């Protein structure tokens, strides 16, 4: 690393999205890039990988293929180099094991000389006269500074933990740390999981599998009206497309918030086949005796109170509008993830655009400032739709970021792939006509 060199891109955080950006910029000689992450090595959700768990999207949604299928860092090339391509073919599943996806990403990161771990970005300053950013990085060997024209934020998200759940590190943990604590969980008399998404489902299934050997009471609650599966119909999957992303971005802010609030089944549910596996396991376990387990929808965690050897958990059931208590020795939170603005951005906070609700405002090209020099990954469900955290759309976003920075289309970006249309054309829209006569609505409900 040359501290006097001016980079075109400094990436902050190395998750799948910024790692994909590093892979896609690697063949481009006109771009000088460097990426920093505070972790010791690439590690993507390894704390919640029960054996056999898979991604919920096909293998083609790897780091590079949707932008450049010929790229050396494709998953298929990884399999070929590791002599696993035929085995993957014979397995006959499009869905990658999560553990294998993690190994694939580690392999890609290790090939890239411009990706640096154990590198904590402390501060970012902007020199307006030079129109350059100075990034201060703390590494084991000391502090260094790098200068760049553009920043790409890829610091990722953190598990959601309600304030009233904080302060109980021995009894309340995030689903992200499940495997680290599993041995301890198996010694408890009662375990409660809160959260009805894929993570909560996988943990419930894993603990249910061993309930006979250990005899604990296993509770699984969600505030959702039911334990619902994701809608993965092919026409629904067209919503994970450039077409729908553009349409969603064109809506006004309040309408986008309203729409995203109605789309939980598109991205927050459980894979249908996994829902069925849970039911089949419950059926199998109940053959000879009742199972010490409870599953309850419509129940929002409201409060936590610590007793001598257990927690008193207060829930509110939305159907009957009443609160009730459960006792549990441990609580596993599977409530999803949220974005937190890195402290290193504080000196340049005034350069960032914000919407009317105090959220980072993204331009269509995923930049967050007027000069289109600060870009953000994995932010903006409220502006670009529910596909923002989707691994399958990472290449689309990275292609747009690269094309914007270079000012030309290096990676072609598809604009229309869906068979369906998400809005009428401008020419088809009827202009309202003022009239004093009575009008009769012909709006249909289907």
UniProtKB/Swiss-Prot annotation:
Q: Per the record, what are the reactions this protein catalyses? A: putrescine + NADPH + O2 = N-hydroxyputrescine + NADP(+) + H2O
Q: Which GO terms describe its molecular function?
A: monooxygenase activity
Which Enzyme Commission numbers does its entry carry?
A: 1.14.13.252
Please tell me which top-level EC class this enzyme sits in. Answer: oxidoreductase
Give the record's keywords alphabetically: FAD, Flavoprotein, Monooxygenase, NADP, Oxidoreductase
Pathway connected to this protein: Siderophore biosynthesis
A GO term (biological process) for this protein?
biosynthetic process
This protein's cofactor list reads: FAD
Record-linked InterPro entries:
FAD/NAD-bd_sf, Lys/Orn_oxygenase
Q: Which residues bind NADP(+)?
A: 54, 56, 98, 199, 223, 267, 301
Residues that, per the record, bind FAD: 17, 37-39, 44-45, 56, 121, 378, 389, 391
Which purpose does this protein serve, as stated in its record? N-hydroxylating monooxygenase involved in the biosynthesis of fimsbactin A, the major siderophore produced by A.baumannii. Catalyzes the N-hydroxylation of the aliphatic diamine putrescine into N-hydroxyputrescine (NHP). Putrescine is the preferred substrate, but the enzyme can also catalyze the N-hydroxylation of cadaverine, with 4-fold lower catalytic efficiency. Cannot use lysine or ornithine as substrates. Uses both NADPH and NADH as the reducing cofactor with a preference for NADPH.
Subunit comment = Homotetramer.
Can you quote the domain comment? Contains an N-terminal Rossmann-like domain that binds FAD and a C-terminal domain that binds NADP(+). The smaller third domain consists of three alpha-helices (residues 70-114) and is involved in oligomerization.
Similarity field: Belongs to the lysine N(6)-hydroxylase/L-ornithine N(5)-oxygenase family.
Its recorded name reads Putrescine N-hydroxylase
Per the UniProt record, the source organism is Acinetobacter baumannii (strain ATCC 17978 / DSM 105126 / CIP 53.77 / LMG 1025 / NCDC KC755 / 5377)
Identify the coding gene: fbsI
């Amino acid at each position: 690393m040359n501290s006097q060199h001016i980079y075109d891109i400094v990436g902050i955080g190395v998750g799948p999205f910024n790692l994909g950006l590093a892979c896609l910029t690697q063949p481009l000689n006109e771009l000088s890039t460097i990426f920093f992450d505070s972790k010791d090595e690439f590690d993507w959700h390894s704390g919640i990988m029960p054996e056999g768990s898979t991604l919920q999207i096909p293998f083609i949604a790897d780091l590079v293929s949707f932008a450049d299928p010929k790229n050396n860092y494709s998953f298929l090339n990884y399999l070929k180099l590791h002599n696993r391509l035929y085995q993957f073919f014979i397995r006959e599943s499009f869905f990658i094991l999560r553990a294998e996806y993690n190994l694939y990403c580690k392999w890609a990161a290790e090939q890239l000389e411009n990706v640096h771990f154990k590198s904590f970005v402390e501060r970012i300053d902007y020199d307006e006269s030079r129109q350059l950013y100075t990034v201060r990085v703390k590494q084991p060997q000391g502090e260094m500074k790098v200068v760049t024209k553009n920043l790409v934020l890829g610091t990722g998200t953190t598990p959601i933990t309600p304030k009233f759940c904080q302060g109980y590190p021995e009894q309340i943990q995030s689903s992200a740390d499940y495997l680290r604590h599993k041995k301890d969980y198996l010694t408890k008399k009662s375990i409660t999981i809160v959260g009805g998404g894929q993570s909560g489902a996988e943990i419930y299934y894993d603990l249910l599998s061993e309930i006979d050997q250990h005899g604990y009471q296993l509770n699984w609650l969600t505030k959702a009206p039911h334990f619902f599966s994701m809608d993965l119909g092919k026409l629904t999957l067209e919503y994970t497309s450039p077409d729908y992303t553009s349409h969603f971005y064109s809506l006004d802010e309040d309408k986008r918030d309203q729409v995203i609030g109605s789309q939980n089944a598109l991205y927050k549910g459980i894979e249908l086949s996994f829902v069925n596996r849970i039911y089949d396991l419950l059926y199998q376990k109940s053959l000879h005796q009742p199972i010490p387990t409870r599953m309850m929808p419509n129940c929002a965690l409201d409060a936590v109170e610590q007793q001598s050897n257990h927690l008193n958990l207060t829930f509110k059931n939305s159907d009957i509008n009443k609160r009730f208590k459960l006792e549990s020795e441990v609580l596993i939170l599977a409530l999803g993830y949220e974005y937190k603005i890195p402290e290193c951005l504080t000196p340049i906070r005034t350069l960032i655009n914000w919407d009317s609700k105090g959220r980072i405002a993204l331009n269509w090209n995923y930049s967050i400032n007027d000069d289109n020099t600060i870009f953000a990954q994995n932010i903006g469900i409220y502006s670009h739709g529910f596909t923002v955290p989707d691994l399958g759309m990472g290449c689309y976003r990275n292609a747009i970021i690269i094309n914007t920075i270079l000012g030309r289309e290096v990676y072609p970006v598809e604009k229309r792939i869906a068979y369906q249309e998400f809005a009428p054309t401008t020419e088809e829209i009827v202009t309202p006509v003022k009239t004093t006569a009575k009008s009769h609505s012909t709006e249909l409900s289907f």
